[in-house]
Regions:
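A short SAM/SAH-binding and catalytic strip from SAM-dependent methyltransferases
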Residues: 110-123
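Class I SAM-dependent methyltransferase SAM/SAH-binding core
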Residues: 43-45, 51-101
Length: 161
C-alpha cells in the first residue's frame, strides 16, 4: 500500500517551485546526505529504512555504503530486491532488526540518519542511545521528524525552515 501511494520513499518533502514530488524527495534526501558530509566509502546507517528508497538514493548520490534497518522482513526482502534491480546492491543493503537494540558493533558507522522513523520508538532516549553507541566518535546523527506544538507561531522566521 505505501509503495503504491508514496513510491519507494515513505516520507514528506516540501515542494519548491516547479519540482515534481520525486524531485522534492531527492532534494530532501540529498540535503540530509550533504549535512552528514557523506563520501564514497563511508559506512552509513539508515534507521527505519522502509523499503530503502532513501538508502538507495543516498548511496547513489554519495557512493557511501548504506545499511538500512527495519523491523519488517517483507520490507527487507522488497528493498534488497530493489537494490539489485537498480544496480546498487554493492552500495546499499537492508537488514531486519530493531533500532531499539541495534545489531551492530559499537562505533561502526561514519554517520546515521533517520527520516520520520525514530518518532515511533517506544523509548526515544533508548533509541538515540543505541544510535550514539554505533556512531564512530565525532560522527553525526541527522534526523527528520514531525514535530507538533500548540505554541506554533508561523510569523517566527526560524520555524518556517
Amino acid at each position: 500500500f505505501y509503495e503504491w501511494g508514496w513510491g519507494a520513499c515513505f516520507h514528506f518533502a516540501d515542494r519548491r517551485g516547479r519540482e515534481t514530488f520525486a524531485q522534492s524527495l531527492l532534494r530532501h534526501e540529498y540535503y540530509l546526505a550533504s549535512r552528514l558530509a557523506l563520501k564514497a566509502g563511508d559506512c552509513v546507517l539508515d534507521c527505519g529504512c522502509g523499503i530503502g528508497g532513501p538508502a538507495r538514493n543516498i548511496a547513489r548520490f554519495t557512493r557511501a555504503q548504506v545499511t538500512g534497518i527495519t523491523i519488517n522482513q517483507f520490507q527487507v526482502d522488497r528493498g534488497n530486491a530493489l537494490c539489485k534491480q537498480e544496480g546498487v546492491s554493492h552500495l546499499a543493503k537492508l537488514v531486519q532488526g530493531d533500532f531499539m537494540n541495534l545489531p551492530f558493533k559499537d562505533s561502526s558507522f561514519d554517520g546515521v540518519y533517520a527520516i520520520e522513523a525514530t518518532c515511533h520508538a517506544p523509548d526515544r532516549a533508548k533509541c538515540y542511545g543505541e544510535i550514539l553507541r554505533v556512531l564512530k566518535p565525532g560522527a553525526t546523527f541527522a534526523c527528520y521528524e514531525w514535530c507538533l506544538t500548540d505554541a506554533y507561531d508561523g510569523s517566527e522566521r526560524h520555524k518556517k525552515r
